[in-house]
Amino acid sequence: MSRLILDEQAIRRATTRIAHEIIERNKGVSDCLLVGIKTRGIYLANRLQERIETIEGIKLPVGEVDITLYRDDLTVKSTTEEPILQGTDVPVDVTGKKVILIDDVLYTGRTVRAALDALMDLGRPEQIQLAVLIDRGHRELPIRPDYVGKNVPTSKQEQIVAKLSEVDGIDEVTIEQKTS
């Protein structure tokens, strides 16, 4: 059984609000860079880029980071298999930039920690801010988002399923019971 948390219109409103908050907090966006965490974070970053361009008339660079190599909670089945860093693409030097790291759902904080490691390997940003569509709680690390589309308290027996039209053909966020 699933329960709808955000529909297409609510996701659009949340990303528009986050875009305004990014502009306000940074007093403009001249030194900002948007970086999406693969996979859905990239599409959210592109949507934020469009919203910010509509509001400010500035097209921010958008990068992507694939944190596969950095995950500390991956289970590797064979000792010969190692996670591979793939597809990380940040079009400008992060040094001195205000980097807005973007993901769909914030849960334990491990994915964000891994993304921070990947970003720091690319240079020394002036500041890193975190934007998420959904914050579901249950943090295992001291990570807190700067921008949140919606806080959705959950139990550990529930999961948040974020779907974006670019990947899934529909924009919606649902909460579901985990299946064992």
Swiss-Prot record:
One of its GO terms (biological process) is DNA-templated transcription termination. Transmembrane segments: none annotated. It catalyses: UMP + diphosphate = 5-phospho-alpha-D-ribose 1-diphosphate + uracil. Substrate binds at T39, R40, D103, D104, V105, L106, Y107, T108, G109, R110, T111, R136. Its EC number is 2.4.2.9. It is an enzyme of class 2 (transferase). Keywords: Glycosyltransferase, RNA-binding, Transcription, Transcription regulation, Transcription termination, Transferase. Belongs to the purine/pyrimidine phosphoribosyltransferase family. PyrR subfamily. Homodimer and homohexamer; in equilibrium. This is Bifunctional protein PyrR. It comes from Halalkalibacterium halodurans (strain ATCC BAA-125 / DSM 18197 / FERM 7344 / JCM 9153 / C-125). The gene is pyrR.
